[in-house]
Amino acid sequence: MALIKHVKGVHPKFGDDCYLAENATVVGDVVMGDQCSIWFNAVVRGDVNSIRMGNKVNVQDGAVLHCTYQKTKVVIGNNVSIGHNALVHG
């Protein structure tokens, strides 16, 4: 089962029909649309700001999504694929 953690009482929210690999990590202020997938060893860290994903977003193996404290959020549109081991930093 994926590691899903809250930060300061804020829990990740998932749309319908999402897939999380067994060792994926999703933390904090993260909102995912429908039919998203987070693959093996990927990390989506909404611990210091928010991360928003549209529908049908594919975060491939080893990718990391993070944001900057009190500066920039991460916003991903619909039908986006984030490649293996990519770093997306707001």
Features from the language model and the residues they span:
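Short, flexible, glycine/charge-rich loop motifs used to bind or transfer phosphoryl groups or to couple energy/partner
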Residues: 7-10, 26-27, 47
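Terminal amphipathic alpha-helical/low-complexity segments used for targeting or macromolecular assembly
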Residues: 1-17
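Acidic/polar low-complexity surface segments
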Residues: 1-2, 70-72
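A structural motif detector for beta-strand N-caps
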Residues: 12, 17-20, 24, 30, ...
